[in-house]
Regions:
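Mature extracytoplasmic/luminal segments of secretory-pathway proteins
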Residues: 6, 76-79, 398
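Detector for intrinsically disordered, low-structure N-terminal pre-sequences
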Residues: 6, 13-15, 64, 117, ...
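Serine/threonine-rich, low-complexity intrinsically disordered segments
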Residues: 6, 10-12, 42, 306, ...
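Predominantly soluble domains enriched in secretory-pathway, periplasmic, or organellar proteins
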Residues: 171-505
Length: 505
């Protein structure tokens, strides 16, 4: 799909050489997130550690694609002439003095910059091909270097397109087989949902057509994806394989997060607007059958590990509400002194809920709730260092956002916007294991980097990898939970928020 409005290009460089990135398909009007800022890895990986193989062939890029950027094209500026200058969304390295080609190291950097503007396997969704293409041929209305390609039959355009297209069949030696899970992340400002394959840490599908997507969850059989749509106040039901929207279900108000009953029979949607509540959607008929009243607008809604209860949290009323899912009525409440933010659940050996870890507004840490006692029993503050983030990002009210218990129940992971990091604690003793720095964002015109603004957390089913959505960086960070080392930073779209794992069946 061609882009329909020009965007202002900015210089983008990634300092963490060796980390591979995959492009994503975007709406026509959505500028790629990497055009707004440059992300750098503040905790560099050792050489060769945890790196994933790129989906696009580097040697083809160097031998066939890169020469096009140096080529003289009558009546047009050379790509090299413009894209070695500052303030360019696609940046090319300056040739070494007296050389007519780039060194291998420079070509690697050119390659990394190019793949951010590419959707592997899909030339017509790749900005690298659409931006310099003539508008009448499906390109952007304006390109400062002129109409480099008059048509999609231009030999050079076809060369780049073939490089992009061939990525679908190029499998790097030693690559793992297709994984048994997918990580879904809602890009709230891009109107897309990106789907990541944990085996390659690349985007393998993009779902379009949902404005302001927020929560995401799945039917137990994995055939449906449920997305809460903030713009239309509906629940979108999406076919997982095709990405097509099957149905829109009207809600009682503006939604935030949602969850699924353990048997898959009910979708529970938190309603943020007053008076709040939890909408119940019957999964067979896809009808909203009732709204469970609670005190205050619902920011988050979860089902406990044993499936007996749903737990909602309200920012404005500061209330944590436990709903009995058999009676579909509020069973008990717990009042906090601050707004209730994300939560995570620890189970007893019999599957019942032992503790709930609750993030609160203005707290760089979390509260600990004993579920049986129906009381807060502790409050854990995250370390003061690292620090220095959150203010410029406008997130002083949410210094800690995003929390999750690993599927094996052995660790608790807690995001900190203030630290621009994620902290790991052992369970059940809550001993600090360490932290992992998240990408810094270096925007043009700013001398001091900002943080990536981590939002939400999910895991692979084997608990080996944690994924964190970075709303300020347009990316998802993958981290090895054993070594506490970053594996990959995956560009996904503008302002990624909710993130969830689907187990394929």
């Amino acid at each position: 799909m061609p882009h329909t409005k020009p965007v202002t290009c900015t210089l983008l460089l990634v300092a963490a050489a060796g980390i591979s990135f995959a492009g994503t398909k975007r709406h026509a009007d959505a500028a790629p997130p990497d055009l707004a800022a440059k992300a750098t890895n503040s905790d560099p990986l050792p050489a060769g550690a945890g790196q994933t193989q790129p989906a696009l062939d580097f040697q083809i890029f160097k031998t066939k694609v890169e020469p096009i950027f140096l080529k003289e094209r009558p009546g047009h500026a050379r790509c090299y002439g413009c894209h070695t200058l500052p303030n360019r969304g696609f940046y090319l390295e300056t040739l070494p003095p007296g050389s007519a080609e780039w060194s291998d190291e420079q070509s690697r950097r050119n390659y990394q910059n190019a793949v951010r503007l590419v959707v592997p396997g899909d030339p017509l969704s790749s900005r690298l091909l659409i931006h310099p293409l003539a508008p009448e041929a499906g390109g952007d209305p304006f390109h400062s270097g002129g109409r480099q390609f008059q048509s999609q039959t231009d030999p050079d355009w076809l060369t780049i397109a073939e490089w992009v297209r061939s990525s679908q069949t190029e499998i790097a030696p030693g690559s793992p087989p297709a994984s048994a899970s997918r990580v879904y992340v809602t890009n709230s400002a891009a109107d897309t949902i990106a789907v990541i394959d944990p085996a390659t840490n690349s985007v393998v599908q993009v779902i379009h057509g949902i404005e302001l997507p927020h929560g995401v969850n799945f039917s137990p059989d994995g055939t449906r994806v449920y997305v809460s749509n903030e713009s239309e106040s509906v629940l979108d039901v999406v076919d997982r394989q095709s990405g097509e929207i099957l149905q829109k279900i009207s809600l009682s108000g503006h939604p935030n997060n949602m969850t699924i009953s353990k048997d898959g029979g009910r979708v529970l949607v938190g309603i943020r607007t007053a008076p709040g509540g939890v909408d119940v959607i019957e999964a067979t008929s896809l009808k909203r059958v009732k709204t469970i009243p609670v005190h205050g607008g619902v920011h988050n809604i979860y089902v406990t590990p044993d499936g007996k209860y749903a737990v909602s949290g309200s920012i404005d009323s500061k209330i944590f509400t436990v709903i009995d899912l058999q009676s579909e009525q509020a069973a008990w409440e717990l009042k906090f002194d601050k707004g209730v933010r994300p939560m995570a659940f620890e189970a007893n050996p019999d599957g019942s809920t032992r503790r709930v870890f609750v993030q609160l507004s203005e707290l760089n840490g979390f509260a600990v709730v004993d579920f049986a006692k129906r009381a807060e029993v502790a409050r854990i503050k995250l370390p003061d260092q690292p620090g220095g983030f959150g203010g410029a990002e406008g997130r002083r009210g949410t210094p800690s956002h995003g929390i999750g218990v690993s599927p094996d129940g052995k660790s608790l992971w807690v995001n900190s916007t203030q630290a621009n990091a994620v902290f790991a604690y052992s369970l059940p003793d809550l001993q600090l294991l360490g932290h992992v720095a998240l990408p810094e964002v270096h925007s043009l015109g700013r001398r001091v980097p900002t943080g990536s603004v981590p939002e939400w957390i999910t895991f692979t089913p084997d608990s080996k990898t944690i994924y964190i959505s970075n709303s300020g960086a347009g990316s998802v960070t993958a981290i090895d939970t054993k070594t506490l080392k970053q594996i990959a930073v995956i560009p996904v779209g503008e302002v990624p928020k909710r993130i969830n794992t689907l187990v394929l069946r």
